[in-house]
Amino acid sequence: MKNDNRIIKNTIKQFKEKLCKDFSQKANITSITRKLAVFIDTILIQLFIKNKLHFGDNFCLLALGSYGRRELQLHSDIDLLILHTEKVSNIQLQRAQKFIQDCWDVGLEVSHQITTVSSCANLASQDLSVISTIMDMFLLCGHGALMEELIYQTHTLHMWPSHQYFFAKLQEQQNRYAKYGETAYNLEPNIKNGPGGLRDLQILLSISKRHFKIKKLAEGIGYGFITDKEYEELKYCQNFLWRVRFALHMLAGKPEERLSFDYQVKLAQFFGYQDQSHILAIEQFMKDYFKVIKRNRELNEMLLQWFNETIVYHQKQKIIRLDDEFQLSNRFIEVRNNRVFKQNPQSILKLFYWLVKRPDIEGVRASTIRLIRESLFLMGKRFRESKETANIFINIFRTGNDPYDALQRMNRYGVLAHYLDCFATVTGQMQYDLFHAYTVDQHTLFVIRNISRFKKNEYAKQFPLCAKIISALEKPEILYLGALFHDIAKGRGGDHSELGAIEAQQFTQRHYMEAEDSKLIVWLVRYHLLMSQTAQRKDIYDPKTIEQFCQLLPHARYLDYLYLLTVADICGTNPTLWNAWKDSLLKELYHAAKTRLHKQQELLDEAALISIRKQYAMDILISDGISSRVIQDLWSQFKGKYFLHESPEVIARHTKAILNSKQFPVVIIMPHHSQGGTEVFIYMPHKDERFTITTSVLSNHHVTIQEAAIITCDNQFDLDTYIILDENNQAFLNEQRARDIQKSLCDHLANTGRLPAVSRRRLSRALTHFNVKTQINFIDDNTNHQTQLFLVTNDRPGLLATISRVFLTLNIHLHNAKIATAGERVEDMFYISNQTGYSLNHEEKTILKEKLILEISKSKY
């Protein structure tokens, strides 16, 4: 018996290998999935007969789910139902269990149920998944009357009438969408369960089976709910997804459903995609994938809406006239006749204007969605150059209401891509990195959604400054259009901000926009990264930084638009990207620039600013009973840079801690004054290796450094400030953890022995799939006798500790650091000098660059 099972197992293996070979040679995927199902039939029937279950009328073996539909993928589960009569003996039931064991022994991934017809029907009446799989059952072997009885007992006359089944399946889909983030455009999408995936096809078949009692979706053409063209589109989507899924199973050697980064690369290679000058093979493959997902979801939405109207709202319609062309039917917008778009193509856009103007409209009637899709060819050159068309499109953004849902529908139905050629090029465009979580088109729409959220009361607490600014914004449509175009040139090669500004300029001219409005939109697109780059890469406490930033703003009102776009952009790039620290940096930059622009104050010299901050801090300390002479004696040792970088409140807090301390080092861990991060303040006798020690200790405690200010005072004491975040990129809330870090820093900084070892931690799975080439550039700052070192490399645990060790080895002094991580990519700015306190010369730069590249390459673990 064991030998028989081994032979069968080997036969299955050989058959699957043959199928994989055929598939690799472009065999038809529908034929392959059916061949596999039929082959598995023969194995199961053979095992069923071997266990003597085919005699008499006691047992029936049924295939369920995708296996029942004859759509078996390479490593899909084989769903089986064994029905038996009430009179079976224990010996016969043991044979049924032995049959299942034989299935497992030959390597079949079988999920099964052994039950009676009545028990199965009872379970189906309570469980949506059971009734759904039963509807796909296929008789393999045994007494067919048992299956017929189950079909009768689970008929809509007895359970799950079509309207109840429809609502349950609709809720199931909504729950599934919520689980996968409401979008199909995630970095590592699930081909089976994600929005737009294979489940979106299966729900259409299940509901149509339940309502129309059909066996195949093609039969639905006769009922009028699907056209020949739509059916062909669904078949195309299905075949594409089946091919990808079969290849995914083949490459993974298991039932893998997620297109993880490593499999995306392999799939692109398998399907013959090749890298091009400005777009990777993987990005081309995923763009095709996302386009199919988008089309699949679009058809899913339209046909479910049709079911909703047919199954649920088949009663008398409540009609409300909107204008000569549109009306509401049970709160869904529809055309008043099927000639509307042909007679006036501009009405295609007008429909979406109504959706924005009337937020009470719940959606679009399925018949009208179908008409939109069939009328896209009308949106040609003449349509796009029409002034009426331009006015309607701009008015979508001028209603004062949220345009996100309407724009999302315009994207799903293909209207945006037909109206804006440049939008068509970014539809489905992904970027192969961890920073951008969505395709460019979906990210763009999320940015617009975020802008709309700033207006809503439920988001005012999360974005109070944004809510305040947008409430007074003169022309919100400018902000929306800036958002629509800010990434429009992604994937072309070159500077997407500059290329996008050209597209925006052409758009504003074609849409007859006022010169000042056009100028602002184009400027927003060109400079949409300015604020985030300034806040995260430069010293925003330096008045020169604020002055340089403000010089790029043609008018004070530009700042409001740029701030709102920046926050919306960051929040729409990746759900994990926005945090309190970024929030605080942008707010501080905004307020500093606002003061400079609105008060038109003269740029104060450093001495004046230092004097002002000292006086405020002095007042705080004197009110606490500390002598001004003691304060001045201490401050006389501090560099002016310290007073520029810190607020008066923080200066007072640091001063008080130092004066009250009886031993060194002084280590204070406290919330940063902006509450966006946690501050680590260190004051101690000068020690060259203190930056290396500090970065190593913080790395071992799994915290990340966002900023570092390193100062050696005139009395040869070090005065250093770090801003740190926890693993979730948030400020510390755990006081015990802060105390542990404080103690560890004190112990190691006081120790004159060896440097603390940096604990080795594995890279996350996602990080291992990306390789950012280490790039190092130098810029000399002759005013401050410093060199700016800009470093780009792969993120990894302990990176800053590695860099600090190189600095220590080469006697490089760090003065300031700005740390920025974008997914797998680190972009760090270090302000350094040589051991004599001057900018690095050419030889020193060369040695430092070579050493950094070497040590960073060795630290990738």
Curated annotation (Swiss-Prot):
Residues 679-760, 788-861 form the ACT domain. Residues 440-562 form the HD domain. Residues 1-321 are annotated as: Uridylyltransferase. Keywords: Hydrolase, Magnesium, Multifunctional enzyme, Nucleotidyltransferase, Repeat, Transferase. CDD domains: ACT_ACR-UUR-like_2, ACT_UUR-like_1, HDc, NT_GlnE_GlnD_like. Pfam families: DUF294, GlnD_UR_UTase, HD. Its EC number is 2.7.7.59, 3.1.4.-. GO terms for molecular function: [protein-PII] uridylyltransferase activity; phosphoric diester hydrolase activity. It catalyses: [protein-PII]-L-tyrosine + UTP = [protein-PII]-uridylyl-L-tyrosine + diphosphate; [protein-PII]-uridylyl-L-tyrosine + H2O = [protein-PII]-L-tyrosine + UMP + H(+). It comes from the Bacteria. Residues 322-678 are annotated as: Uridylyl-removing. GO terms for biological process: regulation of nitrogen utilization. Uridylyltransferase (UTase) activity is inhibited by glutamine, while glutamine activates uridylyl-removing (UR) activity. Its cofactor is Mg(2+). Belongs to the GlnD family. NCBIfam families: UTase_glnD (TIGR01693). Has four distinct domains: an N-terminal nucleotidyltransferase (NT) domain responsible for UTase activity, a central HD domain that encodes UR activity, and two C-terminal ACT domains that seem to have a role in glutamine sensing. This is Bifunctional uridylyltransferase/uridylyl-removing enzyme. The gene is glnD.
